Amino acid sequence: MAHRRIALAVLVTLLLSAFRPCLAQQSNDDTSKHHRSATAGGFTPTTVVVLVALITAFVLLTVFSVLINRCAQARAPPRRAFRSTASHQPVGGAAAASRASRGLDKEVVEAFPTAVYGDVKARMAAKSGPLECAVCLAEFADSDELRVLPACCHVFHPDCIDPWLAAAVTCPLCRANLTAPPVSLAAAESSDLTAPEEAVQEEESEELDEASLMATFTPESVIDFGATHDHEFDRAGYPHYRRTQSAMDAAPDRHTLRLPEHVMKELAADRRHRRAASLAGYPDSVERTPRWLTSLWRSVSWQRQSRADWDAGEEHGGSKRVHPVAGAQDETPSGSGSDGSKENSDSDALNRV
């Protein structure tokens, strides 16, 4: 468009400059007849040449601009298609960033191992403690369903972890990338076996250091040591601190579940079989319970459990409650004999308590 405007401006300017001598010649009455006879239509040869040159230049500019527009339009669709594919299907690092921003697909999340905690607890080792969800910080009940992340073996409630995985591709607890292939079970078991051995070796070396340090102490050296090097006592307490830290690190993880792969497959198959059997009798109850209702039920059950623990603490704290005795007689509203029997039964009940 800019080329066309420039060409039109140049053409108009040249036409005006060419018509000025023609108008001046037509105003001269003496030479008008000579110019009309010299040129057909009243134009001089110079004017005709200029007009032909301008028209030719205008045509060339028009053709050139049309060719440029056609070439631009021919190249535009591949660029737009590339941009659209790049925005929706990026390659390399951009693809990972796009997946990280939009999370995992629902099919991928549903493919993660799931099982019922009651079945899992029966297969777990006796030394391992109860598991709990790292999102809601609630212990799993025997009837709760748990989802295991294959990259780190952390367990969560499906209603707690599914919204997170819809917007992220990492574990909310350890930030492990769930799009990467999971670590093999053999490597995980080998690391679990080597970790206690390293902890034992470290504790033995610390005990030897402490024993050698205590063996060098004498009453005189202790007095001199305490008078001149007070800050060195921190080193004596350092092995104890290291052992405390190692004991804390060796504490059981309440958010990790490590079972053999075939066991997880068996648990998942049992869960699917139970679910199919339960839905066979109730075809209308295929839809899952809403997440907000499940969360509300968990909070209510937690409050009930806290209230029951508080009542139990009050009961064991020293205040005794009088419970009815099975053998006590019921109250009868007739006569003094009934009053006497009532007092006797109450006194017997209090004595028994």
From Swiss-Prot:
PROSITE patterns in the cross-refs: ZF_RING_2
Q: Which UniProt keywords apply?
A: Membrane, Metal-binding, Transferase, Transmembrane, Transmembrane helix, Ubl conjugation pathway, Zinc, Zinc-finger
Stated EC number for the protein is: 2.3.2.27
**Zinc finger boundaries on the chain: RING-type:** 133-175
Gene Ontology terms: cellular component: membrane
Principal location? membrane
Query: What membrane topology does the UniProt entry give?
Result: Single-pass membrane protein
Q: Where are the transmembrane segments?
A: 48-68
Q: According to its UniProt record, where is this protein located?
A: Membrane
InterPro entries hit by this protein:
ATL1/ATL16-like, Znf_RING, Znf_RING/FYVE/PHD
Q: Which GO terms describe its molecular function?
A: ubiquitin-protein transferase activity; zinc ion binding
Function field: Possesses E3 ubiquitin-protein ligase in vitro.
Q: Which PANTHER family match?
A: RING-H2 FINGER PROTEIN ATL16
List the protein's name: E3 ubiquitin-protein ligase Os03g0188200
Q: Which organism is it from?
A: Oryza sativa subsp. japonica (Rice)
Q: What is the lineage of its organism?
A: Eukaryota, Viridiplantae, Streptophyta, Embryophyta, Tracheophyta
